[in-house]
């Protein structure tokens, strides 16, 4: 029993926190790249940031395409933002951290139908207005009359009394 516990502890030490991250599909990886490109376009960003972990990744198929929602963390590097893709950019140990929410919708051919990327400084966290924007992105390109909710038309006509 003791050997089993020791080997389990050693295995957990080698896996670390990276082992708990979700495995990303090809669509999710592409969405992460789109989100990083979008993040590095913003003028207030001076230095490049690198992705240090994906906390959550969801993918939903709609009739107009695929909706991807990602929650991930970024940390500041020593490179200017124009060089963010270069492999020699190293993470600054005390660099700023950001927690990002990205919602991206792609059609079946891979064309971007809509996107939002919100990356506040880590201590803030995602807020409700971003959740509403995320829902709007998920519905991009969908037919608003293509589906109905149960009971949606149950009381659409007033009862007539005789």
Swiss-Prot record:
Position of the signal peptide: 1-20
Disulfide bonds: 79-89, 100-119, 103-134
Cellular compartments per GO CC: extracellular region; extracellular space
Annotated localization: Secreted
Residue ranges listed under propeptide: 157-162
Upregulation: Strongly induced during adipocyte differentiation.
InterPro entries with a match to the protein in the record: Chemerin (IPR029562), Cystatin_sf (IPR046350)
An individual GO BP term: positive regulation of fat cell differentiation
UniProt PTM: Secreted in an inactive precursor form, prochemerin, which is proteolytically processed by a variety of extracellular proteases to generate forms with differing levels of bioactivity. For example, the removal of six amino acids results in chemerin-156, which exhibits the highest activity, while removal of seven amino acids results in chemerin-155 which has slightly less activity. Some proteases are able to cleave at more than one site and chemerin forms may be sequentially processed by different enzymes to modulate activity levels.
Superkingdom, taxonomy of origin: Eukaryota
Keyword line: Chemotaxis, Differentiation, Disulfide bond, Inflammatory response, Secreted, Signal
Expression tissues: Expressed in the differentiated adipocytes (at protein level). Abundantly expressed in the liver, adipose tissue including visceral, epididymal, and brown adipose tissue.
Role description: Adipocyte-secreted protein (adipokine) that regulates adipogenesis, metabolism and inflammation through activation of the chemokine-like receptor 1 (CMKLR1). Also acts as a ligand for CMKLR2. Can also bind to C-C chemokine receptor-like 2 (CCRL2), but with a lower affinity than it does to CMKLR1 or CMKLR2. Positively regulates adipocyte differentiation, modulates the expression of adipocyte genes involved in lipid and glucose metabolism and might play a role in angiogenesis, a process essential for the expansion of white adipose tissue.
Name of the protein this chain belongs to: Retinoic acid receptor responder protein 2
Name of the gene this protein is made from: Rarres2
